[in-house]
A protein has these predicted regions:
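A conserved structural motif in NAD(P)-dependent oxidoreductases
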Residues: 60-71, 82
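Catalytic tyrosine of NAD(P)H-dependent dehydrogenase/reductases that use a Tyr as the general acid/base
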Residues: 3, 7, 15, 90
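Alpha-helical segment proximal to the catalytic Tyr-Lys
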Residues: 23-27, 84
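Short C-terminal tail/terminal secondary-structure segment
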Residues: 76, 87-101
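Conserved SDR Rossmann-fold cofactor-binding beta-strand/turn motif
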Residues: 31-41, 79, 92-94
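A glycine/serine/threonine-rich, flexible loop-to-helix segment
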Residues: 2-3, 27, 37-60, 70, ...
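Conserved catalytic loop/helix region of short-chain dehydrogenase/reductase
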Residues: 1-6, 20, 29
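Active-site helix of classical SDR
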Residues: 10, 18
Length: 101
């Protein structure tokens, strides 16, 4: 397995920054949120998915790898009126993988 210390630390930093900026910018009626993607079809994940895509998909309760339209739906929600009262949230879009760790 590959060590992911620096990657994990950078993601934790993004999560903290999201909450801190939401608190700071909320009085200006500015929402700040983050999307935390799990494994998705992408150039970055291509080699990993080729080597282990089936086993990664089995880890997700939804049983598959994320697709671009899965991510787009969350982004549209946050950018729309429907997400106007959501701030400081880190939304996992991972097929439920977060629930298994």
């Amino acid at each position: 397995p590959m060590d992911t210390y620096s990657y994990s630390a950078s993601k934790a930093g993004v999560h903290h920054l999201t909450r801190a900026m939401a608190r700071r910018l909320g009085p200006e009626h500015i929402t700040v949120n983050a999307i935390a993607p799990g494994p998705f079809e992408s150039k970055m994940m291509a080699a990993t998915l080729k080597a282990a895509g089936d086993s990664i998909a089995r880890m997700a309760p939804l049983g598959r790898i994320g697709r671009p339209d899965d991510m787009a739906g969350v982004a549209v929600y946050l950018a729309s009126r429907a997400g106007a009262y959501v701030t400081g949230a880190v939304i996992p879009v991972d097929g439920g993988i977060e629930t298994t760790s």
